[in-house]
């Protein structure tokens, strides 16, 4: 029975039983605690917790699931997969244990003709939680299972939770006995290879708290209603019904293995375990990568993007280890599409994008792999020559940090080479790097000598931010800090230039930098007896997300802790910042409208008149896409959409479609910014305009890459946009005047001039190459005979580039015939003793036979000119730093040839 038929029978069975069919959710949900959807019930969690009322009493779905904690085990055995399909039926306060057992048993054992899977009831076993007598009794009553085929297990095996706080409850698992070929009898508690788990019925009745293991967590209490959550492994049922030994032989994964086998010189399942592991890695990871890309993930350096990158890199390297030297990822994606497309049509409809992203990662990683593999070989050789078998943490860190070689690949390659890696040392160096980066960032941001100095104020309560409603507020000074140390008073001239002066107020209208929006500037002035005190606010930062630190320059008077003050945000600055921030929301919405929902925000910066927006996307935008994004943005600005801000419960806000950043931690109650109804809805704590027209024109300046899979759009807004356009207009007018053509003809005129310039450059290059060829003829004519060896060893003109030298030595060597011949050319620099000295050596086969290899001869040149070089026996090159040694270098070469030849 094919997998698509297994899926269809499952859904049909439960729909006939009154369940609502619910499509699979994306493997990515707006949940900062969950990297990927890893169970069928995840999309129903709000229903199970009673946070939302389900629109149906019972449901059924087949959910895409991804689990990557044991990614390193994939392929080593046939039990692990990173992607799998979880078929499930769910009851929200409707049926409970009896209904779940009856429905599952019927589907498994009903005949194929009656819509079931036709499994032999005598081969089915069940496990229940230790004290769940009710479930054990139902298995005997409903299914007729004898007591010896119902086994009891503890919390680690038969008490289910997601591994994080949320729903939980006792479970009952159904196993299929695959027979004595797979191990000894005795049931699941004895052997889970022979007795294969195919379905887990969770009797979800409690809510769990935090914990560190499967058994160590607190049961917080009962859920509002008793629920059922079941999960049947589609791939596992497929291997049983298709009569194959493991999931890699099923109709979904075997086509991928067959594709690889057609390209690799060594086949699958030919007695080579290492090769079989590589085949299975490619099959599993290709499928998971395609699903991730289809659901909007792009390769990156952290979070979900890093998982995808790691999967693709393991695919690529496994193919290399199978001696597949040509690109294969595109073919793999097509095979996944063909196998999985009937169940997941997005793999076909979005194939061009999926393929483009995957192939781009292959191209980039092949470059890294080529250089990194050579470097690793050097490290491995040095490690062995030192008489040890452990690659140092320092070497592993250098490979990672300097050359971009992933630690996972270093670990794999070390293992294959019979070495281990000092992971502890590597992790410590990584931690040190992160600490340095964090400390540097903190120093740049806060310049705090001792953060504990602020602890008392942090504990006393948050600063009240009034800036959403007013730009001027009366406040009281809670604390004064000079260079990170608390003081009772600060006066004009008291702090030296290098010191930072910070005022902490109980309330403030000045916005503290956060959410991509830079801080307000403004003033803090004394009141009453302190009316002469005035400070310019140059920056506002947060401590512990609650305390506003106003960095100030005290311009007059003095400030005393406890005094009343008036804090004022600069109105012009704030207006520009709000234009930038609201403009960012508009550009984000336009990006998603033009590019689709996969264009997900990765960062932003908003300052007066300017915005910068980073988003996940593979490849540059076309001119047409840039134009569309700019047009959609400005159309929305001109529509004068109302801007509404309000607070809402996090789950309700997400249900409204509010955009949330993955990896961000949000409180239960969040602030929502809505522009033009559905046009833009985001979770945001920043300041915004009242209507979209107040943003003013938006001009996109450009779009660029800032990392693999991340693009950046920059734009001017408001008056800055107008000024930019005015400059562009003036520039165009100046060009038109200089070129003596109307403005509309400038592009054609410039293109014509560029073509003429290219033609002139080609003519100059032809003349230069003719000069180089003439030099080759002259140099060959000056060949000298040393023993049995012809030698051309000459100083060349400073105009010769390293590429010219390589061309010359090849030409000259070809003119010297079949006798032993060596050519060595050094370009004499024109810049004096500080200039670089390039040199190239070539040796023909006859010279190499005498032991005169270019890679050895070049060392004599390098020594004399204080340089270095390398290459192969036929051709080597290098450069030095000592032009005065050129003559000595050529003489050293002559001496070596005289010695050998």
From Swiss-Prot:
Q: Entry's HAMAP family?
A: Ala_tRNA_synth_B
Lineage: superkingdom:
Bacteria
Kindly provide the name given to this protein in its UniProt entry: Alanine--tRNA ligase
Name the enzyme group at the top EC level.
ligase
**Residues in the signal sequence:** none
UniProt xrefs under PROSITE patterns: AA_TRNA_LIGASE_II_ALA
Keyword list, A-Z: Aminoacyl-tRNA synthetase, ATP-binding, Cytoplasm, Ligase, Metal-binding, Nucleotide-binding, Protein biosynthesis, RNA-binding, tRNA-binding, Zinc
| Cofactor info, note text | Binds 1 zinc ion per subunit.
Q: According to its UniProt record, which reaction does this protein catalyse?
A: tRNA(Ala) + L-alanine + ATP = L-alanyl-tRNA(Ala) + AMP + diphosphate
Subcellular location per UniProt equals: Cytoplasm
GO biological process entries: alanyl-tRNA aminoacylation
Please list the residues that bind Zn(2+).
581, 585, 684, 688
Instruction: Extract one GO molecular function annotation from the record.
Output: zinc ion binding
> Which species is this UniProt entry from?
Mycobacterium marinum (strain ATCC BAA-535 / M)
* Comment text on domains: Consists of three domains; the N-terminal catalytic domain, the editing domain and the C-terminal C-Ala domain. The editing domain removes incorrectly charged amino acids, while the C-Ala domain, along with tRNA(Ala), serves as a bridge to cooperatively bring together the editing and aminoacylation centers thus stimulating deacylation of misacylated tRNAs.
Which Enzyme Commission number(s) are on file for it?
6.1.1.7
The family this protein is said to belong to: Belongs to the class-II aminoacyl-tRNA synthetase family.
Function according to Swiss-Prot or TrEMBL: Catalyzes the attachment of alanine to tRNA(Ala) in a two-step reaction: alanine is first activated by ATP to form Ala-AMP and then transferred to the acceptor end of tRNA(Ala). Also edits incorrectly charged Ser-tRNA(Ala) and Gly-tRNA(Ala) via its editing domain.
Phylogenetic classification of the source organism: Bacteria, Bacillati, Actinomycetota, Actinomycetes, Mycobacteriales
What's a Pfam family this protein contains? Answer: tRNA_SAD
GO CC terms of this entry: cytosol
User: What NCBIfam families does the annotation carry?
Assistant: alaS
* Obligatory cofactor(s): Zn(2+)
């Amino acid at each position: 029975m094919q997998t698509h038929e297994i899926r269809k029978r499952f859904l049909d069975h439960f729909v006939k039983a009154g369940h609502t069919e619910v499509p699979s959710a994306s493997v990515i949900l707006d949940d900062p605690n969950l990297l990927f959807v890893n169970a069928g019930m995840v999309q129903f969690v709000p229903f199970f917790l009673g946070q939302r009322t389900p629109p149906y009493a019972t449901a059924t779905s087949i959910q895409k699931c991804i689990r990557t904690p044991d990614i390193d085990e994939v392929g080593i055995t046939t039990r692990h997969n990173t992607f799998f399909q979880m078929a499930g039926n769910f009851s929200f306060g409707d049926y409970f244990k009896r209904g779940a057992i009856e429905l599952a048993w019927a589907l498994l054992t009903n005949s194929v003709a009656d819509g079931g899977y036709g499994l032999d009831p005598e081969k089915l076993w069940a496990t229940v939680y230790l004290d769940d007598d009710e479930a054990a009794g139902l298995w005997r009553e409903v299914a007729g299972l004898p007591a010896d085929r119902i086994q009891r297990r503890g919390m680690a095996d038969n008490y289910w939770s997601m591994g994080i706080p949320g729903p939980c409850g006792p479970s009952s698992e159904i196993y299929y006995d695959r027979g004595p070929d797979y191990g000894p009898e005795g049931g699941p508690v004895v052997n889970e290879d022979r007795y294969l788990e195919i379905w887990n019925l969770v009797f979800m009745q409690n809510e769990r708290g935090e914990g560190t293991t499967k058994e160590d967590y607190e049961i917080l209490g009962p859920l509002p209603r008793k629920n059922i959550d079941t999960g049947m492994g589609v791939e596992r049922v497929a291997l049983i019904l298709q009569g194959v030994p493991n999931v890699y032989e099923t109709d979904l994964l075997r086509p991928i293995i067959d594709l690889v086998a057609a390209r690799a010189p060594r086949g699958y399942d030919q007695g080579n375990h290492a090769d079989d592991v590589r085949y299975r890695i490619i099959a599993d990871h290709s499928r998971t990568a395609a699903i991730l890309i289809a659901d909007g993930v792009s390769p990156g350096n952290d979070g979900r993007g890093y998982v995808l990158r790691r999967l693709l890199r393991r695919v690529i390297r496994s193919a290399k280890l199978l001696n597949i030297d040509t690109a294969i990822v595109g073919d793999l994606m097509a095979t996944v599409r063909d196998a999985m497309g009937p169940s997941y049509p997005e793999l076909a409809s979005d194939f061009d994008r999926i393929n483009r992203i995957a192939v781009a990662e292959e191209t980039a990683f092949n470059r890294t792999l080529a250089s990194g593999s050579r470097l690793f070989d050097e490290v491995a050789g040095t490690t062995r020559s030192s008489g040890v078998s452990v690659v140092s943490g320092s070497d592993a860190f250098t490979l990672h940090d300097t050359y971009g070689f992933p630690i996972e690949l270093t670990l794999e390659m070390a293992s294959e080479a019979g070495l281990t890696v000092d992971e502890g040392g590597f992790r410590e160096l990584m931690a040190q790097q992160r600490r340095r980066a964090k400390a540097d960032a903190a120093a740049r941001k806060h310049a705090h000598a001792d953060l504990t100095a602020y602890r008392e104020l942090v504990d006393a309560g948050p600063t009240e931010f009034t800036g959403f409603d007013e730009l001027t507020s009366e406040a009281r000074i809670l604390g004064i800090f000079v260079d990170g140390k608390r003081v009772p008073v600060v006066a004009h001239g008291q702090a030296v230039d290098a010191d930072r002066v910070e005022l902490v107020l109980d309330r403030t209208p000045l916005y503290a930098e956060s959410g991509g929006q830079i801080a307000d500037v403004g003033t803090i002035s004394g009141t009453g007896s302190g009316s002469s005190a005035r400070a310019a606010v140059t920056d506002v930062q947060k401590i512990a997300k609650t305390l506003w630190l106003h960095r100030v320059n005290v311009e007059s008077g003095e400030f005393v802790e406890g005094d009343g003050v008036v804090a004022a945000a600069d109105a012009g600055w704030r207006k520009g910042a709000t234009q930038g921030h609201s403009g960012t929301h508009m550009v984000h919405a336009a990006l998603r409208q033009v590019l689709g929902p996969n264009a997900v925000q990765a960062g932003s910066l908003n300052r007066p008149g300017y915005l910068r927006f980073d988003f996940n996307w593979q490849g540059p935008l076309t001119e047409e896409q840039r134009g569309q994004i700019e047009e959609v943005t400005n159309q929305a600005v001109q529509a004068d959409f109302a801007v509404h801000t309000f607070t809402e419960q996090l789950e309700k806000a997400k249900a409204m479609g509010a955009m949330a950043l993955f990896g961000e931690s949000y409180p239960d109650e969040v602030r929502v910014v809505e522009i033009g109804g559905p046009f833009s809805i985001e979770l945001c704590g920043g300041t915004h305009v009242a209507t979209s027209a107040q943003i003013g024109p938006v001009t996109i300046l450009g779009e660029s890459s800032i990392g693999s899979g991340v693009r950046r759009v920059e734009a001017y807004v408001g008056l800055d946009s107008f000024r930019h356009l005015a400059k562009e207009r003036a520039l165009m007018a100046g060009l038109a005047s200089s070129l003596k053509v109307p403005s509309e003809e400038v592009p054609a005129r410039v293109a014509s001039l560029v073509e003429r310039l290219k033609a002139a450059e080609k003519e100059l290059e032809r003349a230069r190459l003719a000069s180089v060829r003439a030099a080759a003829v002259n140099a060959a004519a000056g060949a000298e005979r040393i023993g049995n060896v012809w030698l051309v060893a000459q100083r060349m003109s400073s105009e010769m580039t390293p590429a010219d030298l390589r061309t010359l030595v090849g030409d000259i060597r070809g003119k010297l015939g079949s006798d032993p011949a060596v050519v060595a050319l050094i370009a004499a620099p024109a810049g004096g003793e500080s200039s670089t000295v390039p040199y190239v050596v070539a040796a023909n086969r006859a010279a190499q036979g005498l032991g005169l290899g270019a890679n050895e001869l070049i060392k004599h040149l390098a020594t004399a000119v204080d340089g270095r070089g390398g290459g192969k026996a036929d051709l080597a090159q290098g450069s030095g730093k000592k032009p005065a040694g050129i003559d000595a270098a050529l003489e050293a070469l002559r001496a070596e040839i005289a010695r050998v030849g």
